Curated annotation (Swiss-Prot):
Alpha-ketoglutarate-dependent dioxygenase that in vitro catalyzes the regio- and stereoselective hydroxylation of L-lysine, leading to (4R)-4-hydroxy-L-lysine. Its cofactor is Fe(2+). The keyword NAD does not apply. Its EC number is 1.14.11.-. Belongs to the clavaminate synthase family. This is L-lysine 4-hydroxylase.
């Protein structure tokens, strides 16, 4: 007969081997005290540095993050930055991170080009501190808005309503990892919701939600897949087949992912071989059942994403209105702020501007923009 202590050890080992497959992001409810600290820190940094892109501020970002952020938030992000485990979903929702003064914010502009970044300055400091705690460094991409700064306002644009871009609204934005067509895509993303009065759900999909590696996923390690440039480019820019890459990469048991369903599967000009498209469709049949659309962000919520583990998107909506009790209610249009970051400037140096190591000039899977 086994002793009670031996049986206890066996049960413990059995429990530790049970994999808890993650199917949704971790939700962290920010306390009022933490919100107050973040607001005060944001105001302090505005006075000290003027702008979140101030080189002196960016150079000492990690120091500021660890000194000024509430300790609980710092610990969560620091652990998140190096957790690639089977249980890590790859996204965190910071619920009620900040309080947004809607009157001060004013009406949502018609598009991102009309954003008043003077009103967004404080939020830029707060977002950058979160990336700094990972630690990761905010960057900008010429492939997106020809740079456009370290913070991007994402606003529905009526002229782009039907597109698969952040400016779209009238169609579901398929889940995708940010800039899947780049070899040096962002490591981490933050999405700060200033307003979401249309009550648009955010969609998230994690490669970890599949559980253990399976035969369908193993085929995605083959470097045979087209990764077309996204809908922000003109048709003539994306029509020709480019270099190929794998969809899954990194560790063979706990992989990372580069994936854009809209461009790799449903884009008629993607140029996938029949083998590649068949593999992608088999994978999509599994992946689409694992998409999580349960969370509707409120004003002041922030979603922090590991771009190598978790893809993001959103449901279709009509900008500037929502339905309540069967009635159409007019409202302010959605407004969100996106920041992207890389953990190492050394590893991206071959694709950055000579005079700005935070500015990435990659056009397509290692190819650099030719601006001459």
């Amino acid at each position: 007969m086994k002793s009670q202590s031996i049986m206890s050890v066996e049960r413990s080992a059995e429990t530790s081997l049970t994999l808890e497959i993650p199917t949704s992001p971790l939700i962290i409810k920010i306390t009022q005290q933490e919100r107050n600290i973040l607001s005060n820190v944001g105001n302090l940094l505005v006075k000290a540095f003027g702008n979140y892109e101030n080189p002196d501020y960016i150079a000492s970002l990690h120091l500021h993050a660890f000194q000024l952020l509430p300790e609980r938030i710092t610990r969560i992000l620091s652990q998140f930055g190096s957790d690639f485990s089977a249980e890590q979903y790859g996204a965190i929702v910071f619920q009620g991170l900040i309080e947004v003064d809607q009157d001060d914010l004013g009406p949502t502009p018609p598009n991102w080009q009309g954003a008043d970044y003077g009103k967004l300055n404080k939020y830029g400091f707060i977002c950058s501190l979160l990336h700094g705690a990972v630690p990761s460094k905010p960057v900008q991409y010429y492939a997106q808005r020809k740079g456009g700064g370290l913070l991007h306002a994402v606003i529905p644009d009526e002229k782009m309503a039907a597109t698969q871009t952040g400016s779209g609204s009238k169609t579901d934005l398929f889940v995708h990892t940010e800039d899947a067509f780049l070899s040096n895509q962002a490591d981490f993303l933050s999405f700060l919701y200033l307003r979401n009065e249309e009550r648009v759900p955010s969609t998230l999909y994690s490669i970890r939600s599949h559980g253990k590696m399976n035969p369908v996923m193993k085929k995605l390690f083959e470097p045979i897949y087209q990764c077309p440039k996204d809908a922000n480019y003109n048709d003539e820019d994306v029509a020709n087949s480019g270099p190929t890459a794998s969809v899954l990469y990194g560790n063979r048991e706990l992989p990372f992912i580069r994936f854009d369903a809209a461009e790799q599967i449903f884009n008629e000009n993607a140029g996938q071989t029949s083998e590649a498209l068949g593999n992608l469709m088999d994978f999509w049949d599994e992946a689409k059942t694992l998409i999580n659309s349960d969370y509707i962000p409120n004003s002041g919520d922030l979603i922090f994403v590991n771009n190598h583990l978790c893809a993001h998107g959103r449901s279709a909506f009509i900008a500037g209105q929502r339905i309540e009790n069967g009635e159409i209610i007019k409202c302010e249009r959605r407004q969100m702020l996106r920041m992207m970051s890389k953990t190492s400037l050394i590893h991206i140096r071959s694709v950055t501007r000579t005079d700005d190591p935070y500015f990435i000039m990659e056009e397509h899977l290692g190819k650099i923009f030719d601006l001459d």
